[in-house]
Amino acid sequence: ISAHVGQTEFEAGVGGGQKMKAAGGKKALCVNHEVGNVALDRRCAGFKKGFGGSVDILGTSNDPTEIQKAVAAKLGGGYDTILTLGAGLSGEAALKALESAGKVGKVKLGTFDMSPDMLKAAAAGKVEFLIDQQQYLQGYLPVAIFAQYMRYGTMPAGVVMTGPGFVTPKNASSVIKWAAQGYR
């Protein structure tokens, strides 16, 4: 393999940790719905490095109801920051736990990836950020790179980063618009 187009999971986690630290986070929970999955483990490890403060890993199953209950059970533990590793699965479940406990806005929530409901939550200011791999670029750039390689023999070396990008309350509406048109 000459090049990788995408995001590297550890570095994306570092970026998420730095953003949460900058937002004032002191004690964080990284919700891992598939402990042992190297990519997800690296996301939490990167988050821990970027956050720099206290980070606990909450291992769960991939059952959204169980995730919601597990997060709810941890809310009394002084956590002011939660990062989940998948928007549609653990992100939505964590948001439901925060909503049920009346802690939206009091506990900062961020997640990897995007889902329609989490994009709406970001637009409403309920989520600090969604870490965006920019999947459109992950599909488009390899084709463009391969075409250049076939025509001219040129190929980038190493990783061509498409992420981490961050969808925040400030840009979520734009992302929703472009997603509806198939570009995000």
Model-flagged regions — what are they?
Residues 47, 61-121:
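Hydrophobic alpha-helical
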Residues 12-16, 35-54, 93, 97, ...:
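Short, solvent-exposed amphipathic alpha-helices that sit
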Residues 4-28, 64-68, 114-118, 133-151:
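Hydrophobic alpha-helical segments within soluble ligand-binding/sensing domains
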Residues 23-27, 52-55, 77-81, 104-108, ...:
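Loop/turn elements at helix/coil->beta-strand transitions in domains of secreted/extracellular proteins
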Residues 5-7, 29-38, 59-61, 84-85:
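Short beta-strand->loop
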Residues 51, 137-184:
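Hinge/cleft segment of the Venus flytrap/periplasmic-binding protein
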Residues 29-30, 47-65:
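Short beta-strand elements in bilobed, periplasmic/extracellular small-molecule ligand-binding domains
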